[in-house]
Amino acid sequence: MKYLVLLAGCGLGDGSCIEEVILTYAALDKYGCDYTPVAENVSMQSVNHLTEQIAEKRNILIEAARIGRGRIKDIHEVDFAEYDALIIPGGIGLLNNYRDSHVIKTCVTHFISEKKPVAAMCAGIDFLRRFYGSNL
């Protein structure tokens, strides 16, 4: 199986939760799974993690590359049909950065409409509810 791992930057407050991403990678590696981390190539507000105040804008794809293991791809360049399942680690960045993203909604909709597995953690579950309400 090929897995798509959706990242929203790097850091719990304005991106993907690093611990959840690393544990996802560890589990996929343990079982020899093929996976591709993806993020959208857009700039969004970031958070100063020392003060929790809004900071400068940062590019989500570039930030996600910090934990992308050299495999990170722009989600606009990915053919969702080539993947068997979607994994969404948590992090507040999902809720903030991808609130109005057409390509992210298209991605999630593809996996759900094709009845492919979608796994979400923590804020990833709330993220899915924004698109699909309680119909999950």
Kindly give the residue locations of the regions a language model identified.
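Extended, subdomain-level signal for the structured scaffold at the beginning of enzyme domains
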Residues: 1-113, 126-136
